[in-house]
Regions:
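Short intrinsically disordered coil segments
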Residues: 76-81, 116-121, 208-210, 306-318
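Alpha-helical scaffold segments that mediate packing/assembly in large oligomeric complexes
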Residues: 89, 99-183, 321-326
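Extended oligomerization regions of viral-like shell subunits
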Residues: 156-290, 296, 326
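Short loop/turn segments at secondary-structure transitions that flank enzyme active sites
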Residues: 66-71, 108, 130, 199-201, ...
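Short alpha-helix boundary/capping segments
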Residues: 94, 111-119, 280, 284
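Assembly/oligomerization interface modules of large self-assembling protein complexes
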Residues: 14-100
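Protruding loop/beta-arch "assembly-hinge" segments enriched in small, turn-prone residues
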Residues: 2-26, 30-34, 51, 283-326
Length: 326
């Protein structure tokens, strides 16, 4: 009787298997149908400030009360009545242009699986917001025709509170010499605060004498970020410079702006794009490219009219800043 014997030579080497690397070309890869990106943040200043009527020309003239009338007691029945006057100053909002050009090859547009322009436009709007906030708050690349920024204006009016390493943050905000009191000293009421995002942790960490958190009732609920009843916001478009100010508090109705031309987009298929030195970077027709141009024109001002509490306009400011001590 014939017996079948196993050939042990078949197992002289290690066992083989079809693994993932061998079949990689056969395994489909699932592609995301969305682009993962951060939250789009626009201008914090424009959302907090007061919008005036749109400009019909490059300049917007704004009358501002500059002198208050004075009343007098009359001495006796036949005493002479004195005269007084009231005066107005003129302030001008000058519209300046913000613009950017985004060139892209036509082949890239054709081959892309996404609507590239739909992805680009919100980010351009965010970039405009960063430029606006940086110029108005911190004088970053501001046009020469624009006034001093909010931080510079507050600094010149000596409306600055310095926070040292050992200082009590609560007192620096709420006490007599705090940022809120600085604004009130100029005859204004604080209606908002704009702060660097690092202030969130500073406020969460504030505790009373018994060690209880001041701004949080428990660790589960969300923290309500408001100071003395006024809301806070934390711009995260990259414009807020904590080296110049940790927080800006003030009457934001005194930060007014007017738009000459809201942001508009225009697509070009012909033309040239130049470098800053004048050399040609792209010839749209020759390079088979298109370019998206975004343009906006606006201006702003701080009216800061005279009031009965602070008549000296050099020391009167509707804003105060909290900054890190040197």
């Amino acid at each position: 009787m014939f017996k079948r014997r196993m050939n042990l030579r078949l197992f002289d080497t290690d066992a083989n298997v079809i693994d993932r690397s061998g079949a990689e070309s056969l395994i489909p890869t699932q592609e995301a149908n969305e682009i993962i990106q951060g939250t789009i943040t626009q201008s914090a200043v424009l959302s907090r400030g007061r919008k005036l009527a749109n400009m019909t020309s490059r300049q917007y003239k704004m009358p501002v009360l500059d002198m208050l009338p004075i009343a007098y007691f009359v001495n006796g029945d036949t005493g002479q009545k004195k005269t007084t006057k009231q005066a107005w100053d003129k302030k001008f909002i000058i519209a300046e242009e913000i613009a950017v050009i985004v060139p892209i090859p036509e082949a890239v547009l054709d081959d892309a699986e996404y609507d590239i322009w739909a992805e680009v436009k919100p980010r351009v709007t965010e970039a405009f917001g960063k430029v606006i906030d940086g110029a108005i708050l911190f004088d970053v690349d501001k046009p020469s025709t624009w006034r001093d920024g909010v931080v510079t204006t507050a600094t010149k009016a000596q409306s600055v509170v310095t926070l040292g390493a050992s200082d009590n943050l609560y007192d620096k905000i709420m006490a007599e010499e705090g940022v809120i009191a600085k604004v009130e000293d100029s005859g204004y009421f604080v209606n908002g605060h704009m702060a660097d995002i690092s202030m969130r942790a500073k406020l969460r960490g504030l505790k009373d004498a018994d060690g209880n958190p001041i701004f949080k009732s428990d660790m589960q609920g969300a923290t309500s970020y408001s100071l003395d009843g006024s809301p806070m916001n934390f711009p995260n478009n990259g414009a807020f410079d904590k080296s110049k100010a940790l927080m800006i508090s003030g009457d934001f109705s005194q930060l007014v702006y007017s738009i000459r031309q809201d942001i508009t987009f225009k697509l070009f298929t012909e033309g040239v794009v130049q470098n800053t030195d004048g050399t040609i970077a792209y010839n749209l027709m020759q390079n088979d490219m298109v370019a998206l141009r975004a343009v906006m024109r606006l201006g702003w001002e701080i009216p800061n009219p005279i009031n009965a509490l602070k008549t000296d306009k050099t020391k009167r400011c509707p804003f105060s800043i909290l900054k890190v001590g040197e």
